[in-house]
Amino acid sequence: RAIRSNIEFATKVLPGLDCTKSVVSMLPSAHMYGLMFELLYELSVGAHVHFLSRVPSPKIIMNALAEVKPSVVIAVPLVIEKIYKSKVKPVLEKEGIRFLMKLPVLNQVVLNKVKTELINAFGGEFYEVIVGGAAFNTEVEAFFKRMGFPFTVGYGMTECAPIIAYDD
């Protein structure tokens, strides 16, 4: 019953996923979050699931996202945080960018540029990144909210199949 309830919930919050869309499965299917939102839900709506053929590393994941161009990205916080630390933080720490981030109008220009680069890093065609399976770094989450990045954080546990709460 809990699995069916999670599928019904996912159908409401991810209405754009259908037989014409794709996801990259990078989480282990032994993990309820990965099983539920990278396999069972996709099967229920007929979406294409692309499995990684090797153990996921940042490079393998980024290559898969670029190749598949998924409609939804399902990830654990560690994946998102590694992308943030490797692609975003070095740019934001440059002296000129730090200065621009202090200026009211120009900071939004910088944020929009960073957002575009991040969207492209995730394949460029997704409409949402769903983060769950562990606590999300508050600095990264606050920055993603500030720039208007399309992400959602889910909270849960295996015994609940797995979603308990969903912060949209």
Model feature map: region roles:
Residues S22-M26, E128-I130:
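Extended hydrophobic secondary-structure segments that form protein cores and membrane-embedded regions
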Residues R4-S22, S29-E117, R146, P150:
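Conserved AMP-binding/adenylation subdomain of ANL enzymes
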Residues G46, G133, G156:
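Conserved G/P- and acidic residue-centered "switch" motifs that form tight phosphate/ATP-binding loops
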Residues L103-E141:
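Alpha-helix-centered segments that form part of catalytic cores
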Residues F136, K145-F149, M157-D168:
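Active-site loops of AMP-binding adenylate-forming
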Residues R54-P56, G156-E159:
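Short, acidic/turn-prone active-site loops that include or flank metal/cofactor-
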Residues R1:
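Conserved AMP-binding/adenylate-forming core of the ANL superfamily
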